[in-house]
Amino acid sequence: MSAATARHILVKTREEAENIKKQIEGGSGFCELAKKLSKCPSGNKGGDLGSFSPGQMVKEFDQVVFNEEVNKVHGPVQTQFGFHLIKITSRD
């Protein structure tokens, strides 16, 4: 596996992440919610993190991106930065 692309939404609490995930499951757009609610600068780009290889992100993030189903929202995933909802957009 050489690279993946993903979007994410970063918030401070598990509860916030779970509430946002429910909104997405209810039909709200991932990109729009990332722009509105994410604490990461990538939120301005709809949570887009671009392309990255294994080892470029924190371990917990990599484990999801390089092992879980593409085009599905995963999480909340806890890292040192907070709680993430992760949408894997592609993986080679």
Each language-model region and where it sits:
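Peptidyl-prolyl cis-trans isomerase
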Residues: 23-60
